[in-house]
A protein has these predicted regions:
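An alpha-helical, amphipathic repeat domain used for nucleic-acid recognition
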Residues: 1-237
Length: 237
């Protein structure tokens, strides 16, 4: 079973246990496995993972301190630790675990290709993750540099410009339609057109239409559709 699927199953079990235990979770171990990521060992049921970001870093640090105090006290007594969270902490921990599931799914998509924030939001929403979790996850991924609208825009432009001959204006409009901010779109276009002559793109487009036997009016109409200004089209024709 994939790790994210396993964690999803474990969280489902945890939700059931939470209902049966008057909305509190008891844990016997907390282990940090990566920066900000922890494996939680409940006293009953399978382990699950949480990221401190989703619990609230300060809140999680406080939780760790409380757990360590109980852990060392129990160890001195020779007893097995069973640290019971408050109802609020239990619900926060459950939310944090579910948010981590959304993060795992998002990272799977990002590992395959660049994503925009809007596009990734829609994909997570389609998987039925809660909007509150989605926004927290996207904030975290942006903060960590895993998610970038600028990188997405640059990658999208490289692919688009290889397959289509369009003006900068047309490409700018297409990025805006993909919910990229005006500032980010302009920045990505500056990079994409750094060594590209827009007039050369138009000239190649016109030549391709001429070779297909299109008349002047049809060529003008098609070139304008791709965002090129009429004045420049007439000049090159």
């Amino acid at each position: 079973m994939h790790e994210s699927d396993s964690n999803l199953a474990n969280v489902s079990i945890l939700e059931e246990q939470l209902e049966d235990s008057k909305n509190t979770i008891c844990i016997q171990g907390i282990k940090q496995v990566l920066s900000g990521l922890y494996k939680i060992h409940p006293t009953a049921g399978p382990v699950f993972f949480v990221r401190d970001w989703y619990f609230g870093i300060e809140n999680f640090e406080k939780l760790l301190e409380e757990f360590e105090t109980v852990f060392f006290e129990d160890r001195e007594k020779g007893e097995k630790t069973s640290f019971c969270l408050t109802e609020e902490q239990s619900l926060l921990l459950l939310d944090a675990s579910e948010a981590y599931l959304a993060e795992r799914y998002a990272m799977g998509l990002l590992n395959r290709s660049e994503q925009s924030r809007f596009l990734l939001f829609q994909k997570l929403l389609k998987k039925k993750f809660r909007i509150s979790y989605i926004n927290e996850v996207l904030d975290f991924l942006e903060c960590e540099g895993h998610l970038s609208d600028l990188r997405f825009s640059e990658a999208w432009l490289r692919q688009r410009m290889r397959s289509k001959k369009e003006s900068r204006t047309k490409l700018y409009q297409e990025l805006l339609l993909r919910s990229i901010s005006s500032q980010t779109a302009k920045q990505a276009l500056d990079t994409a057109f750094e060594d590209v002559d827009e007039e050369e793109i138009l000239r190649d487009l016109i030549d391709s239409y001429i070779s297909k036997g299109f008349d002047r009016d049809k060529i003008i109409k098609k070139c304008m559709y791709y965002g090129f200004p009429l004045k420049v089209i007439n000049t090159l024709l």
